[in-house]
A protein has these predicted regions:
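Short, conserved beta-strand segments within well-ordered enzyme catalytic domains
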Residues: 31-33, 79, 138, 166
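Conserved AdoMet/S-adenosylmethionine-binding subsite of the radical SAM
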Residues: 117-218
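N-terminal pre-triad scaffold of radical SAM enzymes
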Residues: 14-68, 85-94
C-alpha cells in the first residue's frame, strides 16, 4: 500500500470519463478528463474543459430561438433577446431543465462534480480489460494537475489496486507537484505546445522555462 500521501475523499470536477479508449496510452484504458487548465490555447480540442467548475455552454449556431428554455426556467435566469437566449450564469443552479428541453441540443452543461470514490468505482469496472491488454487509467483534461489533491488521491488508489497510470500534461505545473506525483505515474504524455518562448507565452499564456524544467526532471 502506498501511504506517502494522505488519501481523503475529494470532489473533482470532471468533463467526461471515457471507457475503452485506445489512444491515450498502451492497451485498453479508461480516460478521466478533469476540468480546469492554466492555458488558453486557441487551437484547444476541448475548450469547454478550460474552466474548472461545471458551467453552462450555449452553442449558438445550433439554436433556433424557440424560447423553450426561457419558458422552462422557473428561476427566470433565461431571457430571449434578439431571438436568442441570454443566460444569467451566476444565478444558475444547474438543474439542467433547459438542457433537457432544447430540441436542438444547443444547451449543454459541461462538467460534473463527483467524488474520488465514485470515480474509482467506474475505473475498477474494467480491471480485467486493463490486465489482459496491458492497459490502465489515463488522467487528462484540461490539465490534470489543476486538481492536484484529487489527482493524487486517485493515483494512490490506482496504484493500491495495481492499475497502470498515465497522466497527460501541458507541463505548466509547479515542480513540487511533479515531484510528489512522479512515483505514482507509470507514463507521462507530455504535450509541449510550442518551442518558441515568446510565441508560446503570447498564444497560450504558458512559460517555456517552467515546462522544460519539469520535462528535464521527469
Amino acid at each position: 500500500m502506498i501511504n506517502k500521501y494522505k488519501v481523503s475523499e475529494n470532489r473533482l470536477s470532471i468533463m467526461e470519463i471515457e471507457r475503452f479508449a485506445f489512444h491515450d496510452g498502451p492497451g485498453i484504458r479508461t480516460v478521466v478528463f478533469l476540468q480546469g487548465c492554466p492555458l488558453h490555447c486557441p487551437w484547444c480540442s476541448n475548450p469547454e474543459s478550460q474552466k474548472r467548475k461545471p458551467h453552462l455552454l450555449h452553442i449558438k449556431n445550433k439554436c433556433i430561438g424557440c424560447g423553450r428554455c426561457e419558458a422552462i426556467c422557473t428561476r427566470g435566469n433565461i431571457s430571449i433577446q434578439d431571438h436568442f437566449p441570454v443566460f444569467n450564469r451566476q444565478a444558475c443552479v444547474a438543474c439542467k431543465a433547459c438542457e433537457r428541453i432544447c430540441p436542438q441540443n444547443a444547451i449543454k452543461f459541461v462538467g460534473e462534480s463527483i467524488t474520488s470514490s465514485e470515480i474509482m468505482e467506474i475505473l475498477l469496472r474494467d480491471r480485467d480489460y486493463y490486465l489482459n491488454s496491458g492497459g490502465g487509467v489515463t488522467f487528462s483534461g484540461g490539465e490534470a494537475f489543476t486538481q492536484f489533491e484529487g489527482l493524487m488521491d486517485l493515483l494512490i488508489q490506482c496504484k493500491n489496486e495495481k492499475l497502470h497510470t498515465s497522466v497527460e500534461t501541458c507541463g505548466q505545473v509547479n515542480l513540487d507537484k511533479i515531484k510528489q506525483a512522479l512515483p505514482l505515474i507509470d507514463l507521462f504524455l507530455f504535450d509541449i505546445k510550442h518551442t518558441d518562448k515568446d510565441l508560446l507565452q503570447k498564444e497560450t499564456g504558458a512559460n517555456l522555462d517552467t515546462i522544460l524544467t519539469n520535462l528535464r526532471y521527469i
